[in-house]
């Protein structure tokens, strides 16, 4: 990583002049300022804000930095952040968070984060995603939480969506359900492939024919949850459902399904069973009857990612965290 001295050398000025430019001192000549700014850009120099804190405090506590892509600004994965903060505090580490507001914003957020010279970095996302890691973060002490990247050297902690859907399908088969209607998440969602593969493998392993399964993918975007109502209505013949269990891509889809089924006088689970996925915080038990669903282990993902940094774990690999099946009253 480039230093203040490197910038001064490339610009042909003193370190004091570089410092004055960075603090927007008016006494620096425009031509000199331009050379310094060009050198900063060429070297991708990031000022060491932690050094200022060290000089002020006399010591440097261990610090864990979190890059949050939609994790802090939506309610669906906030347990990841809470677990990271709690784990860091438990082991005497400081932690701070910087939001990433879009894919294009990641480089800016990374520069801002590196200015604080953290001892470790956790990159988090809302929903399992494939990310492109900003170049400035390569070589840093970093771990991924709820996301993966191309580089196999990057350790990551993600939900075991495949096994979760496999085991939940076994539960449905054991309960006697044979006519599933599946509303999966959009095909573009990384978790969708794992979940559908898990379902289909369990179905085949039970000696069943996939041709008897009705499978659909939701469109991308929250606006399309209402589309599920018309899709569901299309599977009623003479007022009767042509399926005996509805497998939903998440609990929000299950919520829409409940409204349609109950409005038609369909009893859950006596006439049709419903299975969700996510165990959306504070919602599962509010379904009537309570929804059988699968827990996304966001709290464990956050804790394991933090411990990876704190304990100095070595090796880059994908660690899949089990997703427990929560059997309630809808199956």
UniProtKB/Swiss-Prot annotation:
Tell me which residues form the DNA-binding region.
Answer: 4-23
> PROSITE patterns, per this entry?
HTH_LACI_1, HTH_LACI_2
Query: Its Gene Ontology molecular function terms?
Result: DNA-binding transcription factor activity; transcription cis-regulatory region binding
What InterPro entries is this protein classified in? HTH_LacI (IPR000843), Lambda_DNA-bd_dom_sf (IPR010982), Peripla_BP/Lac1_sug-bd_dom (IPR001761), Peripla_BP_I (IPR028082)
**DNA-binding found in the keyword field:** yes
Q: Which UniProt keywords apply?
A: DNA-binding, Repressor, Transcription, Transcription regulation
Q: Does the entry annotate any disulfide bonds, and if so which pairs?
A: none
Domain named HTH lacI-type is located at 1-56
The task this protein performs is described as: Repressor for the csc operon. Binds D-fructose as an inducer.
* PANTHER family to which the protein is assigned, alphabetical: HTH-TYPE TRANSCRIPTIONAL REPRESSOR CYTR (PTHR30146:SF151), LACI-RELATED TRANSCRIPTIONAL REPRESSOR (PTHR30146)
Name of the protein this chain belongs to: Sucrose operon repressor
- Source organism lineage? Bacteria, Pseudomonadati, Pseudomonadota, Gammaproteobacteria, Enterobacterales
Which gene underlies this protein? cscR
